[in-house]
Amino acid sequence: MAVDEEKNGRTATATVLVASDDSNNTPSIINGTSDGGKDDVYEVDDADPANLSLLQSIKRFPRVVAYILAACPGILLYGFDMVIVSTLTAMPEFQHDFGEVHRGKPIIPSGWLGIWTAAPSLGNIAGAAVAGWVCDRFGRRMSLMLGAVISAVAIAVCFASAFSADIEVRRGIFLLGKLMEGFAAGQVVCTVQIYTSEIVTRALRGSSQALLPMMTMTGQLIGALVVFACLSIKGRRGYLIAVASQWAFSALLFGIAIFIPESPPHLIRVGQIDAARKAQRRLHRKEVDTDKMVDKISEILEQERETMKRLGSQVRFIDCFRGVDLRRTIIVLVCHMMPQNFGLGLLSNASYFAQTVGIKPYVSVLLLEVGIAVGLLANIISVWTLSVAKRRPLMLWTLSFTGVAWAAMGISGCFDSPVTKWWTAASMIIIIFVCGNGVWPASVLATAETSSLRLRGRTQAVGWAVHGVYACIFAVVLPFIYNTDKGNLGAKTGFVFLALCIFSLGLIWWLVPEMGGRSAAELDLLFEHKVPTRDFLKWSVEKSNLKPSTTPAAGAGVSVSAAPAVVGEDEKKKSSEHVEVVTQ
């Protein structure tokens, strides 16, 4: 329904909120028109972008898809870095050069294993924190290029560590390299998520964010395959080849960062409107009304700026923890906890963990490869799953099943049987498939779509920093739980993750709402009016806590309203009255 009112020779600006009792049809908040739920930012014809199928979306926005895929080497680098410590420590030659003999077998001491495993996460914390500032100050492309350069230097440090004569020096230099590489990976993956969330259309939002776990698993698979291929190489040359292979990702990422267009929302935020229009045109085909898209993004950002001016605040990290944005930040942080809570840290270290339950080194690396391949398959399926399924139920159901699988593994560890090690291996493969097609990509999507556009860079930086802290805690603690020279829990470690799954179910149930199909403007309105978590899906104007005064009109309720969530100041000045129309 379009509402145009001629009054004294000029057109009044109307905000139209269409309410429906159907929980699947959410109201649209637009300027001057009602489109039944469409988002003006991505609208070029009468089809609703939010309701397009995955294939239709790819056909309609092929360039957006191409640029999202082009940014993926940054995630590959992150995934490779995540798995490289666990796979290197499973190599006998690496254990010989960096470990010690315990009960006649070479092992990596729990202390060093813990700190090496934690090093990438520690680096992620600093890298993510810096990414938010670099992205806002110098742009998303510059942040990617800087991360690629730091990564290349870090790989060189890890490579050089093998040539020291003193084992403690070798361990220390390797630690420094992993810290630096973790910094680069944290900066890069945070930047990639910011970039893709800003250029993607609403119809592709779920599928695009599912690429993060999928490409993470791909990076892990590449790392595991490289190490597996190097197992038969004698001497240090085997693991040095594995380390050096990471340079390929750094070089590829640097080249791609030069080529891709800058994020239009970032350019608009820093006042480069003409550059934003050029970047937006590169993201879409000629028939797409990119100027309309840029105008809509500008409008949303301006409205957010006006809101914060009234609160007397500028864009700072502290703003993420104030007012309405506090709730949004908490949701982002909770979702960043999910990967460690369902067991990703242990699954990433499966090649070493499997050896503690009696599986031989060669088979343990093969197990890791199978697990990663299964997880990758699940992540590929999740690209479709997130385009059709609701996020919140998907997280709850897959977490519940995962808890049962961890419990079964823990129970098997209570019995001294040859079956235990194979049951443990099977349980881990089942868990990564279930989570890879459920809670993992769904939680990643929630971290990307929850924050406001204005604070997206800062909120993502805070989220990835907490992600790194949390992963670091698990990296340090887990070896003391399962390693043979400490806790020696083995398969009974499953009980630990059963408890974490139950804890996560509670967090999601109480805190994480269903945000599927909502535009940035709609999410702003939902959070601004403090809609309860479990009411997001069924929210409508009639059930909201907006209290406008009403004036009867033929066939509709008409009310004079205060400034709406997405109407810019310039539009409000064009009209002597602001009309809010609600169909009954």
Give names to the regions the model predicted.
Residues 2-281, 305-584:
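Alpha-helical transmembrane bundle of multi-pass membrane proteins
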Residues 286-288, 515:
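PAS/GAF/H-NOX family sensory domains and closely associated sensor/linker modules
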Residues 290-305:
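Short, well-structured alpha-helical segments
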